[in-house]
């Protein structure tokens, strides 16, 4: 069974950021007004309704629309101008705000720094010990400035404290218990609200 591989060449991602300008026939750095004018002219020329029998015109129209959509969006245009279509692909995958971070971390010096730090720390083993295990399960951790106190309360002391608290709070006994609520009971009575216990 043979695989059906299309003869169409897979489009490569550029890093120069000039192809969309070339589609519209503009120079890199063209103003928004120039982009709009050229887009209108080319869109009318290659519109599928004006060229119903020409599939190449339809494809050209799609390319023109895509170029216009990217070049009129300020953030996409700045990413495209700086990083090309590869930058747009990264923005689609990781978000517009993470494009600079992605290219910074994929640079040769960031990779070299990662390898050097990894070698110096024994494949990050000592970082693991310090951060995760607090250096040998806490045996090597620094002494804290606040001394730890043992809080042991004997049952007799706790019982005396509870009795003294109960004696202080026995000023006003409860005379009336709340009524049971059901589905027909209103949560708030009509009329004035009173938060006092005296009636």
Swiss-Prot record:
Keyword Flavoprotein: no
Membrane-protein topology: Lipid-anchor
Organism listed in the record: Homo sapiens (Human)
Pfam families with a match to the protein in the record: DnaJ (PF00226)
UniProt keywords, alphabetically: Chaperone, Lipoprotein, Membrane, Palmitate, Phosphoprotein
SUPFAM superfamilies: Chaperone J-domain
Protein name: DnaJ homolog subfamily C member 5B
Tissues showing expression: Testis specific.
Localization in the cell: Membrane
Main location as per UniProt: membrane
Annotated GO CC locations: cytoplasm; membrane
Positions bearing Phosphoserine: 14
Subunit and interaction comment: Interacts with the chaperone complex consisting of HSC70 and SGTA.
Disulfide bridges in this chain: none
Post-translational modification: Palmitoylated. Palmitoylation is not required for membrane association.
